[in-house]
Amino acid sequence: MKQLIDKIERGEQALSFTALSRFMKSPAEFVRYKTRPYKKTPGMLEGQYAHMRLFNPCSAAFEYRIGKTTDKNDKRIKLSQANVQNACRYVYNVRSHSKYKNIRQTARRVETHETIELDGYKLRRVLDIDAFDAVYDVKTMGAADITPRKFKWKIYDFNYHVQAAIYVAQYPTIAENIQHIEFLPEFYWIAVTKTDCVIMQCSKELIVAGFHRLQQAFHDWQRCIAADAWKMGSEFYLRHDELIIQP
């Protein structure tokens, strides 16, 4: 684990948003994510398959296997027929949205994997749809989560606003991105369930809040290194007075 931390500090290893969000829950959660097998739920697999069907359909057969097989050497991700049906509902609802066709026509790139640098840290991002002056991110979710009240809760609980900030960042420092916030691309969530699809814009104010939360995460990362607190749970974030970085 120490080697991984050292690589991140030296800029030799990039942090994904998933790994960063685990750290924002607790240092111990980050360590578990990085050191133990990560078992994805059926909902996660359906969401991933829906993404591939939307943005890279030709690769779906090479990445996923539908149904059972006797071939023990088949290393593809296993999906049941029910998983596929649910994923196809997501895909259909996104494509059926009145604005989606125009969004795809204006897109210059889809499912773009990039590594950026912010305040000296390398971060990985995957832009579902990059449309020059706007970035769109598809979120698959349950029916209750798509309501404005519940989705607002998910934004803060899952740090979606931090993800939005990372995805629209254009400058090498957080301060510069906040200073030039009006020049950054717009950010939209394409929130889709098995029965509905809603496109919601992330306000500039919320993106700024995401940058501030990211800045706090970088500060907490340094505190964690200084105190060697990688085994701590969420109580780590309640002990700022005891875990101060020495000048």
Report each predicted region and the residues it spans:
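Coil-to-beta-strand transition motifs
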Residues: 120-124, 131-133, 195-197
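Short acidic, glycine/proline-rich loop/turn micro-motifs
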Residues: 146-152, 199-202
